[in-house]
Amino acid sequence: MTVRNVSTSSPAWARARALAVVLAATSLGAAGCSAVGPSANHGSTGGTAAGSGASGADSFGSPADPGAVKQGGSLVMALSAEPDKLDPALSRSLYSRYVFNAMCEKLYDVDQSAKIVPQLATALPTVSGDGKTVTISVRTGVKFADGTPFDAAAVKASLERDLTLKGSGRKSELGPITAVAAKDPQTVVISLSKPFAPLTAALTDRAGMIVSPTAAKQLGSNFASAPVCVGPFKFAKRVPQNSIDLVKDPNYYAADKVHLDKISYRIITDASIRAANLRSGDVMVADSLSAQDVPGLKQEKSLQVLQSQSLGYQGVTFNIGNSDGVDAPPRMRDTPEAKDPRVRQAFEYAIDRAGLVKVIFNDLNTVACSPISPASEFSSDAAQKCTAHDPEKSKALLKEAGVQTPFPIEMITSNNPDSLRLAQAIQSMVKEGGFDLKIKPVEYASLLDQEDQGQFSLLQLGWSGRIDPDANITNFVGTGGSQNVSGFSDQQVDDLLAKARQTQDVSQRRDLYAQVIDRLHQTDPLIYLYRQRNLTGVSNSLKGVQVFPDGVVRVALAGMAK
């Protein structure tokens, strides 16, 4: 693998200029589409070191000063895609995490520095010497939104639900749990069959959201229709494809810190319309700003743009063995791209990552060739190496594989303008490497359904990222992972990931993940493209909106400026 930079006199720069011309010619068609998708949020070249790019200083926002905000008022936030099921066990999208953040607290949270801090727990877990017993103390005097007491028994019930509910996306995240016990009302004891280093980090996300046992029992499989948790706000109403409303929860244990009366999340899938609504004041917060809109929004005196490097990535995923659905055992598909890794490798060689970052995102995003953020303590130079952009190598690999050229393949993507611009850029690039890429735009909800069912050859989608790399890797490429929509199964990868899960030693895990990523570049079930910036527009009429590296927009403790 080579590492190089792009200069304005290089061939890569010339390709970027040519790509810009292609995109200018196609942008009018893209702008007419308005369905949901993640690319606005959720480079050589491929040969440039991952993480390169000029993206500016991080701005996470600040907590609300109680003396500077009013009591009461309604906040309207525009979401770039509709949240999926509002059930922490079943949810898969970043957009549901925005809503959950205001209504479903977790055992642990992450702070602005991406460090783990207690939330419903009172301290970080204690772990036995053999790593197989984890003890967590939880808050007292807390109630769920329906009045049910929050205690260790409720935590036990919620974790057991995550482990047993059909379709749960949390089971693989929670690892080798064999039992959960409520030692006393304030103490939870988790038993493991083997040490599991990522457990605490997993409890900072949906696996750590504790649901009301009363509501879970009463609603059963319909829990998402009226979710009940512990949080500053509680669920009020949902209008599909339109809005989700939350109202202040008087049962919340820190209700005196909640300033707003109501939060309304409105689904506005077109980035330019979200920006226009920000300018007009019809919405006060907007997620996933388009890189095309950021310069203009920064000039608005009534607005601010919060931006920070995310822990996630955007990429493309090949369907290798998802023949019977993501929950079924992998069974290799009878297609050249599934059966021969040289076809997938050729696709990676054909992509100019730096060109994508420069032309599509104005260098706000950065090149990514790894699921691990360069800022992570688990990162290394080896983990961030990129495959060089080399169209001739791409064509040579296709020839070795004995497939027809140009090799035809269809890619599904969200049909919002930014996602389509990205897809068209990829289409233009890989053509030079011997591919005939067809683009199939679909709504975001449909994309999630199709990837689960294995109804695709190639898809473009990303991941908002987590602080522990296990959550960015194992669920997606580990055999049987809850989000392994590729149906990829590789014993070497599985063995390395299993070893990394069982050790607390950072240096050992760092080395193991570097080996995993090297193997992924050899097999290419998923090609990482770029690491997105968290770009959030906020009205200056609000105080206290924050966006941390986990990508979640935090509005629950915001307030209207006096």
Region roles according to the model:
Residues 4, 75-127, 160, 228:
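N-terminal lobe/hinge region of extracytoplasmic solute-binding protein
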Residues 68, 125, 342-345, 357, ...:
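Extracytoplasmic/peripheral linker and loop segments enriched in polar/acidic and small residues
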Residues 137, 172-215:
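Surface-exposed binding/hinge segments that line
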Residues 151-158, 185-191, 231-232, 260-262, ...:
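Alpha-helical secondary-structure segments
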Residues 204-258, 262:
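Gly/Pro-rich hinge or "lid" segments in bacterial periplasmic/extracellular proteins
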Residues 251-296, 415, 436:
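Ligand-site clamp/hinge motif
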Residues 312, 316-325, 446-502, 549-552:
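Acidic-aromatic pocket-rim loops
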Residues 366-400, 418:
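Structural transition elements
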